[in-house]
């Protein structure tokens, strides 16, 4: 019987600009992403193009402040283990555009970007990539939901519909990104509709008595609180905004990357999880 291990990460990179001084941190981000040692990286707020930043910081002699000419997902994928990259353009403006991206060590067999924008002032999308692994297809969904709760609920329904329509029953699923779920209200809905588990909550169910009680409550259809990790703001994480949900995988480990390095790179802290399929 096969057993595939896969390491994944999700990270809102704040468009490649420092959350402290608003200066480019694209080069440092590439190095930091390499520290994940992840097979698949789910990225939000990826700058596909920004003419103003390119004009101001395009000179290579600027060192760590240099703004590479390539789109950020292409730059991150270059000369790394992530030979494959996909980008879903969501927000478009006069000087550029940004959206979600996926970096993968596995070939991307297919991709689609679903527009789930709820109003004209927030362009949001769900990037669906089908990975062709040695053990079959894996469906990956990169998510960045809106700031307003009513809109997030509609976007969550759009996510549920997208997964139901594109990921056949029995095929493994990973949903990761910035859910902006300030009040932690969406996890139960996703679990009930799609059969997914949240990475940190899944780890919690492995704890002796607590895990047994949570499992019994779920089987009895009672409400059980799902507690994702705190990731925002990165300097002192309090809000549980960033998530990794899986179906068909066992969560072996999950951690939030804390510390001064991550606080300087983005306003969100990244999550890294090790999964087992089979």
Where are these regions (language model features)?
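Charged, glycine-enriched surface loops/patches
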Residues: 61-62, 73-85
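Short active-site-adjacent helix-start/loop capping segments
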Residues: 49-52, 94-96
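Active-site regions of metal-assisted phosphoester/phosphodiester hydrolases
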Residues: 1-40, 68, 82-278
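Short loop/turn segments at strand-loop or loop-helix junctions that form parts
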Residues: 11, 44-47
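Flexible loop residues that form catalytic
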Residues: 46, 51, 249
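Short, flexible/disordered intra-domain loops and linkers
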Residues: 19-23, 50-68
């Amino acid at each position: 019987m096969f057993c595939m291990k896969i390491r994944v990460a999700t990270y809102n990179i704040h468009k490649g600009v420092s959350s402290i001084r608003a200066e480019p941190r694209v080069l440092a981000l590439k190095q930091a992403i390499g520290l994940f040692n992840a097979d698949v990286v789910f990225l939000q707020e990826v700058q596909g193009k920004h003419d103003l930043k390119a004009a101001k910081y395009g000179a290579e002699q600027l060192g760590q402040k240099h703004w590479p000419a390539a789109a950020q997902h292409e730059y991150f994928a270059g000369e790394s283990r992530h030979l494959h990259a996909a980008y879903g353009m969501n927000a478009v403006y006069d000087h550029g555009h940004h959206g979600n991206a996926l970096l993968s060590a596995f070939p991307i067999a297919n991709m689609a970007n679903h527009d789930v924008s709820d109003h004209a002032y927030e362009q949001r999308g769900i990037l669906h990539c089908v990975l062709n692994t040695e053990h079959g297809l894996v469906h990956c969904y990169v998510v960045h939901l809106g700031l307003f709760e009513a809109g997030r609920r509609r976007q969550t329904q759009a996510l549920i519909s997208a997964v139901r329509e594109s990921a056949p029953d029995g095929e493994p699923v990973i949903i990761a990104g910035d859910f902006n779920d300030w009040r932690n209200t969406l996890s139960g809905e996703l679990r009930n509709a799609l059969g997914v588990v949240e990475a940190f909550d899944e780890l919690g169910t492995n704890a002796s008595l607590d895990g047994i009680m949570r499992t019994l409550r779920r089987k009895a259809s009672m409400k059980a609180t799902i507690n994702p990790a705190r990731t925002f703001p990165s300097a002192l994480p309090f809000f549980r905004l960033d998530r990794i949900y899986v179906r068909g995988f066992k969560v072996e480990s999950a951690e939030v990357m804390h510390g001064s390095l991550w606080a300087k790179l983005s306003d969100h802290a990244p999550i890294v999880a090790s999964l087992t399929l089979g």
